Amino acid sequence: IDVNTNKTVCSLDAMKGYILVPYKNEIAVKAGGHFYSLGTSAIVLRPDTEGYVSTKGKWYRGKLMVKMSNGKLVVINDLTLEDYLKGVVPSEMPPSWEFEALKAQAIAARSFALANLGKQARFGYDLKDNTEDQAYGGASVETNKTNRAVEETTGLVLTYDMKIIPAYYSASAGGMTNTNAWGGNLPYLRSVPSFDDGVKKNGHGVGMSQHGANNLAKEGYNAYQILQYFYQNVKFAKLNNNT
């Protein structure tokens, strides 16, 4: 679909691979050594029915926007927040970990995403798919367990002073969490034992320690207790119209 006109520029057979390339400032399909221009610099790929779209060997929910940027093609996954989280939780936390820790991860990741929407707007999208924002692997990394963690916490976010917080987290804090959030102190971040003793510090150490969350879950903490431990005096809110 041409992004500019909203008209279909071509139909592609399912389960077949196609190569899209930049060609004379437009997007073209490469086949048999020939280039077939689609006559536009931005297109949307989406399934005709319920299904997934694929690029570079990975499957994604929603739709893919492909656009020209500085002579190169940029691929953007456009999907709902809850579907996005299904690709974040197993990318950020091992699916084999405790279920309550996975639920805590889902709530933290949802809060982080909403608090940072538009962070990468200068590039034409909201968030990157790596740890500069949050690791995201699309539908290819989903598991039943992590999907259930997302679904059982649908719409739940962390708030402080009636605002959604960017719920920072890292793999491990090395014994104590860090209060310094990139040059500023946030009232809901206080240095606390991270319950990840024996695990080398990995990451910025601000907010929730993922190893610590898993260890607390093993001790019987539920997702809410885990999050209230790492983020002080926060409240939980449920989105009315989650997208």
Question: How would you label these PLM feature ranges?
Answer:
Residues 1-243:
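Conserved, single-site charged/polar hotspot
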